[in-house]
């Protein structure tokens, strides 16, 4: 009886874990046949809504690899950023509202990726400390101006370190450890976490074979999309 109860509970928990999830094809149908999947993407300067001035640089420096690993050709972000800077565009909000087709004519890219940094907070609670990072991603077709993929991803990373058992020492250690935190791995982590939901691109060995992967949070998809209308 007890074993049956435990088994039933396990099934319920598994089913609950699947609630609110969609397959990649259900969530992003325009990334699968008969639609034409984008091959290349240009990343515009990040929109920074956080209080961390260096957040855009951290995110931009870690964006290329996860999207390239997922099968897309990403135009070199440093070169693209310099081109925008020469035109006086330093922030993504300056580009919002412009037709995506301009990126096709100017860069030859099939898609444009908009990135919004919603949160980059360092939190201290006596002996505990963490960094919370929340990013929204929206991929738009430069041919149709339609949203192909959108996602909102947030992570919380503990920066306190191990306890020594001495409260005063631990308080000082937590402050120092958090102040010296290397944020590059955190930026990589949030980008990689979001890309899990992105359908594989042309250069990935499993392209068009991931449509039934049920890994897309409906809530995260809609929150990401909402950034384009704010």
What annotation goes with each model-predicted range?
Residues 27-29, 45, 94-100, 119-124:
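N-terminal post-signal-peptidase region of extra-cytosolic proteins
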Residues 46-48, 72, 79-80, 117-120, ...:
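Solvent-exposed coil/turn segments that connect beta secondary-structure elements
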């Amino acid at each position: 009886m007890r074993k049956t109860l435990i088994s039933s509970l396990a099934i319920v928990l598994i089913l609950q874990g699947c609630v609110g999830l969609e397959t990649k094809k259900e969530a992003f149908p325009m990334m699968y046949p008969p639609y034409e999947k984008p091959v290349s993407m240009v990343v515009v300067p990040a929109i920074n809504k956080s209080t961390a001035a260096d957040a855009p640089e951290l995110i931009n420096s870690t964006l290329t690899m996860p999207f390239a690993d997922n099968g897309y050709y990403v135009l070199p972000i440093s070169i693209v950023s310099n081109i925008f800077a020469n035109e006086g565009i330093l922030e993504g909000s300056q580009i919002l509202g412009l037709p995506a087709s301009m990126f096709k004519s100017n860069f030859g890219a099939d898609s444009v990726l908009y990135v919004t940094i919603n949160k980059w907070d360092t939190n201290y609670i006596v002996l505990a400390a963490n960094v919370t990072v929340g990013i929204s991603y929206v991929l738009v077709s430069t041919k149709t101006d339609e949203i192909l993929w959108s996602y909102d991803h947030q992570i919380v990373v503990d920066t306190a370190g191990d306890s020594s058992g001495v409260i005063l020492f631990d308080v000082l250690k937590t402050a120092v450890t958090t102040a010296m935190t290397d944020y590059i791995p955190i930026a990589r982590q949030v980008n990689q976490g979001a890309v899990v939901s992105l359908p594989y691109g042309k250069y990935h060995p499993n392209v068009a074979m991931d449509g039934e992967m049920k890994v897309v949070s409906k809530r995260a998809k809609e929150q990401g999309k909402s950034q384009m209308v704010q």
